[in-house]
A protein has these predicted regions:
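Conserved N-terminal beta1-alpha1 strand-loop-helix module at the mouth
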Residues: 1-64
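Short catalytic-loop micro-motif centered on adjacent basic/acidic residues
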Residues: 4, 28-31, 84-87, 140-146, ...
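Catalytic beta/alpha-barrel core
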Residues: 5-7, 27-35, 56-58, 66, ...
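Active-site-proximal loop/turn and secondary-structure-junction residues that shape catalytic pockets
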Residues: 8, 32-36, 59-61, 89-91, ...
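Short, acidic/polar
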Residues: 8-21, 66-75, 122-130
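Acidic (Asp/Glu)-rich catalytic clusters
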Residues: 18-22, 39-50, 76-79, 97-106, ...
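Catalytic alpha/beta core domains of metabolic enzymes, predominantly
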Residues: 91-223
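Short, structured segments at the rim of ligand-binding sites
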Residues: 221-304, 309-582, 586-748
Length: 748
């Protein structure tokens, strides 16, 4: 990253520079000691800009102002949202303590800095200064020393080896980052070399006449030196994200089971959604798609004589017919209690749809054998634990092709019996979601206890969709003291669902929210290689993959969101949120009151991700395993060692995704390994890779016919030494047919 120093500018001039300058400023240091800004103007500046800003107010260097005046300005910047605060190590201790507390409270990264304008001190003084800056709150330590010889430069740059050793010894502490370079003409090259050695950013002047210190490069010169001809990703208009297939598939099946007309707005076609429509039609529902071009009845999608990628073909056909890939409304005329499941249903390539339909087939099949089949990679993906779980409800699964684990094609033979049952959630949430949809249809009440739950958010997505269709389900989460204090779902040890029998699905009308799984690829691309703005996303979503926001923030990304406000009557404080939110607060909800047909929606708005200095991170993806491919790419560009838990969850996705990720990273030249449930990745910043010649290796890659792998490879291609050629990109049609066209709007 390149941090441009802005000084001697008014608020209006600074805002114009941040919003309109060409080339675009990546990151800026605002010299509050030199810019004539009032406290109100400081608050406006640091609260309004999406560009990562460093608040700096020098007292030692210039001798202007007092420490008390500097504290007032810096505090205002931090409270307004400054990404970084730079405080000289010479600041009075009490002021340092107060500013450190403010940084912790408001999420600002503290830089403690020391400048040696008279010359470069001894090695001991340099190392002791680094340690002092670290001791007094420096998450980033900045050392700048005037160089009088090449030896001076070498000694300053040697600090990077010293800080690496210190970080390795302090295993329980967050690693401290170092920005160390030499000043003066002799030290000019060190301002570039520091990026090679792991500095999160370097400083540059706005132009050749405004250097803040001797030897400072101008921004345009530094851009060329670091990036060459590579242009950042950028799109002038926000990109609209497709409908969440997690919500859409559940809602389509629920609408088919409701008696009457349901309207699902914001629909966008993809392979899994179209498979759900075909199942809904097989149950007897009538389905129409209403778009700007009018309405049309959805015809059957033939299984015979499909081309190499049947999912891409059928979705492409639908997109051509409707003339729109997003923003349509599904009108589903459900058949309610007269649902008559056919002897054979095809679930496409959808693992979720398979597991939803197994319990529903048992509940609706009147004791008959119902065959469930699929296409693409689905017949190769085992349904681990499904036979044992369903046997507990009196249901028998029989695979048609003998194998150690149950696969489709298979037959399901009921009955599905109500009652009290405890099952393991280690295998995931999808079959549990199917049970939540089927058990309300039975004559008796059921209590379903899930121990060792995984993918918890998806269970509550199901509960949310069911609530919208009039189904009553109570829930209570369990956990130890850590869970009760933090409400961190990864600490939840059990969930109990209480399900009343004899219920009927009621028709509903609501908009399907945008897909955070798809959005994750664009947010990571923006955080790494430029900037991106997205719309159509619910910022209070139950989707597990909204966790990408937390992961990016942990890595240091620059994110902002502007909510359009509550949709369809939801309150600003979220108080009309559903039982899933109650469960997240460790409450029990029996949902005694039937929901309104038009269920309230969440907050929609504009999400922005912009390039920022990134650091290694630790995260647990057990509840959101679909993020693994793109989070792995993120980690490859975050300086340091990242640890990602949940690796064991990847074996039975559209590919053996864990193996596919390791193979991809190894081929790219990224150091990665898996041990137990943890994937470890040694990352290097984009700038370090460019300057050290450590670009990702281009060439021919396989997506393993996995839509999420294809998307991750597409994002990674920006920083490859030659084009990344993906053997199968049509697989993106499974979840986001327009992905490549949408991604192409991010101009380089």
């Amino acid at each position: 990253m390149i941090c441009t120093t802005i000084q001697n500018r008014t608020l209006e001039e600074i805002m114009n520079l941040l919003e309109s300058s060409e080339p675009r400023i990546q990151m800026a240091e605002i010299r509050l000691d030199r810019c004539p800004l009032s406290i109100e103007e400081i608050e406006y500046l640091f609260s309004s800009s999406d560009t990562p800003l460093v608040a700096t107010c020098r007292v030692v260097d210039d001798g202007n102002g007092t420490w008390e005046e500097a504290e007032e300005k810096l505090t205002a910047a931090v409270e307004a949202g400054a990404a970084f605060l730079d405080l000289e190590i010479e600041a009075p201790k009490e002021i340092g303590k107060r500013l450190r507390r403010a940084c912790t409270e408001y999420g600002t990264t503290m830089i403690r800095s020391s400048h040696f304008f008279a010359g470069t001190p001894s090695d001991d003084v340099l190392r002791n200064t680094v340690e002092k800056c670290r001791k007094f709150g420096g998450e980033i330590v900045k050392i700048a020393a005037m160089a009088k010889s090449g030896e001076d430069v070498a000694r300053v740059l040697a600090l990077y080896s010293s800080i690496a050793s210190t970080n390795s010894a302090a295993e329980t502490q967050r690693p401290v980052e170092l920005v160390a370079f030499s000043m003066g003409e002799i030290g000019k090259v060190s301002r570039l070399d520091c990026l090679k050695l792991g500095s999160p950013f370097t400083y540059a002047a706005l132009n050749e006449n405004e250097a803040a210190a001797p030897g400072q490069w101008c921004y345009s010169e530094m851009l060329t030196a670091v990036y060459g001809g590579r242009k950042p990703l950028h799109c002038n208009s926000p990109l609209n994200m497709p409908a969440s297939k997690s919500f859409a598939q559940r809602a389509i099946i629920a609408a088919a089971l409701a008696e009457g007309e349901s309207r699902l707005g914001g629909y966008s076609p993809c392979g899994d959604n179209e498979a759900a429509i075909e199942v809904a039609k097989a149950l007897g529902a009538k389905v129409l798609i209403e778009s700007e071009g009018g309405s049309l009845q959805v015809g059957a999608l033939r299984q015979a004589q499909r081309p190499t990628n049947p999912v891409a073909s059928m979705v492409g056909e639908l997109c051509r017919t409707t003339g729109s890939a997003t923003g349509s409304t599904l009108i589903i005329e459900g058949i309610g209690s007269s649902a008559n499941i056919p002897e054979k249903i095809n679930v496409g390539e959808s693992g979720l749809l398979t597991r939803l339909m197994i319990p529903l087939a048992a509940a609706l099949g009147n004791g008959n054998q119902i065959e469930i089949d699929g296409i693409g990679t689905l017949p190769t993906r085992p349904l681990k634990g499904a036979s044992e779980i369903m046997a507990g409800f009196g249901t028998v699964l029989r695979p048609l092709n003998p194998a150690p684990e149950v696969h489709v094609p298979l037959t399901v033979q009921g009955p599905l019996l109500p009652g009290k049952t405890s099952i393991s959630g280690k295998g995931g949430s999808q079959l549990i979601s199917g049970l939540l949809m089927a058990l309300p249809l039975l004559p008796g009440d059921s209590t379903l206890h899930i121990h060792d739950p995984k993918s918890i958010p998806y269970m509550f997505i199901t509960a949310d969709v069911l609530r919208r269709f009039g189904i009553k389900i109570g829930s209570e989460m369990e956990g130890g003291e850590d869970f009760l204090e933090t409400q961190d779902w990864s600490l939840c040890t059990g969930i109990t669902f209480k399900i009343k029998g004899g219920q009927k699905y009621s028709p509903a009308a609501f908009d399907i929210e945008g897909d955070w799984s798809a959005a994750a690829n664009f947010l990571v691309a923006g955080a790494l290689f430029g900037d991106v703005k997205l719309t159509g996303l619910d910022t209070t979503s139950l989707q597990a993959d909204i966790s990408i926001m937390d992961i990016l923030m942990e890595a240091g990304a620059s994110l902002s969101q502007i909510d359009d406000g509550p949709q369809d009557g939801i309150t600003n404080d979220g108080s009309s949120r559903n039982e899933a939110t109650d469960a997240a607060s460790n409450k029990t909800s029996d949902n005694e009151d039937a929901p309104e047909a038009n269920a309230p929606q969440g907050h929609r708005g504009l999400i922005t991700a912009q390039k920022a200095p990134l650091r290694a991170f630790d995260t647990d993806l057990n509840n959101c395993p679909d993020l693994f491919p793109i989070v792995s790419i993120l980690a490859a560009f975050c300086h340091g060692r990242s640890n990602i838990q949940g690796f064991k969850r990847l074996a039975s996705k559209e590919s053996d995704r864990g193996t596919a990720i390791l193979n991809m990273l190894t081929q790219m030249g990224v150091s990665a390994s898996a041990s137990g449930d943890t994937l470890t990745i040694d990352g290097e910043s984009v700038e370090s890779r460019l300057l050290n010649g450590h670009l990702l290796k281009g060439g021919e890659y396989t997506s393993s016919h996995d839509h999420r792998m294809a998307m991750a490879l597409t994002v990674a291609s920006w920083c490859a030494d030659s084009p990344i050629i993906i053997d199968d990109t049509t697989c993106v049609a499974k979840s986001f047919p327009a992905f490549l066209d949408t991604y192409a709007k991010l101009k380089r």
